[in-house]
Amino acid sequence: MIGLPRTFHPDPEAAPYRIDQRSEYRVKSDFRVDFTNGGHIEAKDFLLDIEGTSVAPERLAEMIVSALNLLRAGPVTIFAMNVVRRGEHQDTEAAAIPR
């Protein structure tokens, strides 16, 4: 595995991310996306479905931008990523509704 954190510049022509709820594996990641017009977003323990048992960090950066439909995305910094089996982490419980 490559050393993290690392910053990537996703290809705007990359294949779009597609949700696959039948996927056996997911990638859990911490990242930051900087916008070309200023500002940024960060996420921790963000889950995306993957095909197979691995994903390259460069592809993960592209998947993040596509999944979140970020039109003004600039560099994506991946701080952590880990492939997990669906159901072996806290994604099987319904999210709490804020009151």
Where do the PLM segments sit?
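Charged, amphipathic alpha-helical segments
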Residues: 2-16
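Acidic, low-complexity intrinsically disordered segments
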Residues: 3-5, 49-99
